[in-house]
């Protein structure tokens, strides 16, 4: 199902652009930064509710799809869509976005605008991860999440925040290299970056195992999953 109104793009870019607005508020207007962040997170959550209620559970096809050429020289598209698995994850993401703003309302007292902007940015990027149908678009959203996560750990982390930040960056970077290799391999073999077309592409069992390990390395660090959680 393709919609006239790009609801998925709205869910992605509302918190991302909202993060820029909150960041522009400045350090000395913390109360305004909190209120704006709550409004933006609340509106994003309401949008996700309309996505959830408008989802047709009688079909397994991708819904609310959007498709626009992005980097035509490499057949990369701005392609979005959701299925019955990704819709609840988007709803959960936007719900937690509201909770994060509320949880940091009194706890975060320094650089409030930066803190709120980081989480709004992360929220939009996570929605992008759950709705991307182009592998490079997915990779861009997935890796861009490293930026706000890196800043949050480095600026508001515990006593060992510098060590934790460096370790997190190295782990994530290493895992991302394995994923990128896997994505490039799939593109070379299939001639497309479309994740939906990859579903239909035949691969040898050994190749599937190696690709699984590459993607597992990237996802394990971001989740984080034992034994790379510390």
Segments (PLM) and residue ranges:
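Alpha-helical multi-pass transmembrane bundles of energy-transducing inner-membrane proteins
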Residues: 28-30, 117-121, 125-207
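Alpha-helical transmembrane segments of multipass membrane proteins
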Residues: 19-24, 49, 98-102, 124-128, ...
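Transmembrane helix-loop-helix hairpins at membrane boundaries of multipass inner-membrane proteins
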Residues: 1-7, 21-117, 191-202
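Short helix-boundary/re-entrant hairpin motifs in multi-pass inner-membrane proteins
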Residues: 164, 210-230
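N-terminal signal-anchor/start-transfer transmembrane helix
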Residues: 10-29, 217, 224
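Hydrophobic alpha-helical transmembrane segments of multi-pass membrane proteins
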Residues: 82, 92, 170, 213-220
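Hydrophobic residues within membrane-embedded alpha-helical segments of Major Facilitator Superfamily
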Residues: 18-21, 40, 44, 89, ...
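Membrane-embedded alpha-helical segments of multi-pass membrane proteins
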Residues: 13-17, 43, 141-148
């Amino acid at each position: 199902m393709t919609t006239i109104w790009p609801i998925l793009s709205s869910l992605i870019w509302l918190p991302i652009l909202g993060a820029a607005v909150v960041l522009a508020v400045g350090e000395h207007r913390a109360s305004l930064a909190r209120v704006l962040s709550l409004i933006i997170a609340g509106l994003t959550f309401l949008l996700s509710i309309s996505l959830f209620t408008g989802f047709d559970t009688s079909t397994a096809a991708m819904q609310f799809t959007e498709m626009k050429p992005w980097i035509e020289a490499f057949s990369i598209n701005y392609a979005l869509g959701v299925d019955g698995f990704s819709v609840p994850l988007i709803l959960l993401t936007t719900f937690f976005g509201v909770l994060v703003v509320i949880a940091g309302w009194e706890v975060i007292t320094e650089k409030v605008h930066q803190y709120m902007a980081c989480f709004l940015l992360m929220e939009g990027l996570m929605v992008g991860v759950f709705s991307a149908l182009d592998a490079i678009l997915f990779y861009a959203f997935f890796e861009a999440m490293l930026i706000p996560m890196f800043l949050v750990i480095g600026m508001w982390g515990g006593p060992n925040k510098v060590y934790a930040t460096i370790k997190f960056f190295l782990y994530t970077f290493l895992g991302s290299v394995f994923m990128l290799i896997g994505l490039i391999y799939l593109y070379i073999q299939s001639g497309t970056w479309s994740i939906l077309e990859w579903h239909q592409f035949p691969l040898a069992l050994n190749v599937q195992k190696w690709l699984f390990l590459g993607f597992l390395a990237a996802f394990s660090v971001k989740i984080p999953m034992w034994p790379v959680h510390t």
